[in-house]
Amino acid sequence: MKFTLVATVLLTFSLSAFAVEYPVLTIASPDQVGFDSQKLHRLDGWIQNQIDAGYPSINLLVIKDNHIVLQKAWGYAKKYDGSTLLAHPIRATTNTMYDLASNTKMYATNFALQKLVYEGKIDVNDLVSKYIPGFKDMPGDKIKGKDKLRIIDILHHVAGFPADPQYPNKNVAGKLFSQSKSTTLEMIKKTPLEYQPRSKHIYSDVDYMILGFIIESITAMPLDRYVETTIYKPLGLKHTVFNPLMKGFTPPQIAATELHGNTRDGVIHFPNIRTNTLWGQVHDEKAWYSMGGVSGHAGLFSDTHDMAVLMQVMLNGGGYGNLKLFDDKTVAQFTRRSPEDATFGLGWRVNGNSSMTPTFGVLASPQTYGHTGWTGTLTSIDPVNHMAIVILGNRPHSPVANPKVNPNVFVSGLLPAATYGWIVDQIYGSLK
């Protein structure tokens, strides 16, 4: 009896000794972790000048050495109703939720894949066709190779798919037109390759739409339910969801985006196109019309605090507190530079050369990685300096500069605030 008790105590002690307890975020002043507060404060006035010049809003959070050292909001979550400036615009707060756009690729799809890889439920060298039946070359395809595509090819954006087939716009998509999720998967299978796989690099939303379907195939769960129940909820995240208006959130909690739906101020038309100011619905057309708001490439909403926790998971090597999602080897595997393009890991953008200066600035370490989102979002994670930055914005919440010349350039997109690197450099430049 005594031997059993002693053995039990020793076993319990041994297990607790090996239990992983990851750092959790706490609040600290900038000076406590090596910043010059006066230099960092200059950023405040510069961002406010951009808001005064017409940039809708910016939410910024900075992490250094496991501490949140700066969290602030500037501007307006909603200042327009259509083309009309509101008499009483809604100010952005540090709790405002934003449409992450392509940062969804990292903090929903990549996080899910990293977890599944760590658990041994998927290998990045697996064929896509293993998880998506019927994923193969079509009889009329000029470029062959779909049946040999691997998940790693999709993650590296070298699979051969076009950047944006515009499935919901029948005028552009033609026979690939789809405004339902079940049809969209079939249209993806039929989407012809534009180049021989692994011969060049084209960043493609289709790649991450495919990855979303693969995750659903493995987990037997919708993508949103999987990440919300197995990643976000265990981490204690309360403002990171797909389709927020269907999950208890209200428009005033969320930053608005395009003024006239997806029409780019009236120059784009297709069946069922939204024309009202987008407020709480994902902006991305493929995510909304073709995927019901939940896609591997876009659709996630979050705030800066929740994003800080997710970035800290990466800095920690895969966990937070007593929760382990994946390990440091998985983080290294996914953030390692691609042989085809040094600015890509497995999905993650990497600070691999000077072409990334507009994103990561000139002062971040070459090991820095993260992603951007079309709506005005940036995440930057620097493992060398143990530092991370998240910028959330609603750049499309302004008029289109010249709809007939380029419907994708908004007035706010012409301001310096539309480029993230200068903000990143000002933060790094404030280090002592």
UniProtKB/Swiss-Prot annotation:
GO cellular component: plasma membrane
Topological relation to the membrane, as annotated: Single-pass membrane protein
Similarity comment text for this entry: Belongs to the peptidase S12 family. YfeW subfamily.
PANTHER family found in the cross-reference section: BETA-LACTAMASE-RELATED, BETA-LACTAMASE-RELATED DOMAIN-CONTAINING PROTEIN
Location within or outside the cell: Cell inner membrane
Chief place where the protein resides: membrane
Record EC number: 3.4.16.4
Chain ranges passing through the membrane: 7-25
Protein name according to UniProt: Putative D-alanyl-D-alanine carboxypeptidase
Reaction catalysis annotation: Preferential cleavage: (Ac)2-L-Lys-D-Ala-|-D-Ala. Also transpeptidation of peptidyl-alanyl moieties that are N-acyl substituents of D-alanine
Gene3D superfamilies in the record: DD-peptidase/beta-lactamase superfamily (3.40.710.10)
Superkingdom to which the source organism belongs: Bacteria
SUPFAM superfamilies: beta-lactamase/transpeptidase-like
Organism: Salmonella gallinarum (strain 287/91 / NCTC 13346)
Enzyme category, top tier: hydrolase
Keywords: Carboxypeptidase, Cell inner membrane, Cell membrane, Hydrolase, Membrane, Protease, Transmembrane, Transmembrane helix
One annotated GO molecular function: serine-type D-Ala-D-Ala carboxypeptidase activity
